Amino acid sequence: MKVVYSDTHRDHDPQQFMVRGKLKRSNEQPERAFRLLAAVEQDGHEVVAAPDYGPGPRAAIHTPEYLRFLETAHARWQLLDDPSDEVMPNIHPFPGQPCSYPESLVGQAGFHMGDNACSIGAHTWAAATASAHLATHAAQLVLDGERAVYALCRPPGHHAYVDRANGFCYLNNVAIAAQHLRRVHPRVAILDIDVHHGNGTQGIFYRRADVLTISLHGDPRHFTPFFTGHAHERGDGEGLGYNLNKPLALGTDLDGYLPALRDACASIRAYAPGALVVALGLDAHERDPYKGMQITTPGFATLMAEIARLGLPTVLVQEGGYLSDDLGPNLASALRGFASSA
């Protein structure tokens, strides 16, 4: 399988991440991508670079105000009186209340950053745009005839909304890939198997019928992102019925996961898309630091084989999966499983 990768991410190394009121080192570190890259190289996958697709693919998903903010925020932040090294918000709009766009950079940070897990450093914009190019190129390779392509994206993207960074994510790579596939295919499906709900992806396509979004994730009553990912969220307007959430109990193992995945695959078959984008989170693993589920390393092969049996042109986009000795083996298992049924 072709693997699209760039080392531009290496200088994006967020230092701050708030956990239960304490600032800690972010779990979204460059070492994640290095371990994933080592795994695909060890298994003999062909690693290719992505060209610069320009601003078009990201602009097709994200607002101009948000993109300007992401590109300029860090340099502008450093001009403030006594700034931190990274941009972090300390105030947010209140949902359901009137909200005007602020001129103040501090206000813009609160407007465009949904939490304290998406700090912006000097190299964040370059890493995020490079990551989006990887997803776009993977989609283009699939349009050019590849059965499946893996985009080794870092930073991840599925928590990013049209105008808001969130949960380690800045540009929504799976949404960008899906929109690129829409240039050819009237219908595209997104299947998110990250342990966390793909809230940004849901928000982007919530009122659209041309992209089916399905997410399997830890029950948001007890697990981040908490406020979205419930089964009753089914889309709105033209998109009603085209957003499916399958929240799973924390600690779910392969036996509990497979029925939900098979239901998701049945929904994809019924939708009959021309192509599929998989938000490939590996953080449902039993020893992932987030400890949300109990999928084993061989279990990822089983899950991905089930997805491959859909028989669709498929873009695999890296999402979560955090530092442990199992991270690389989990990816290797997932890709082998997909190849076994492709």
Q: Which residue stretches match the model-derived regions?
A:
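HDAC/HDAC-like amidohydrolase catalytic core signature
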Residues: 1-191, 196-342
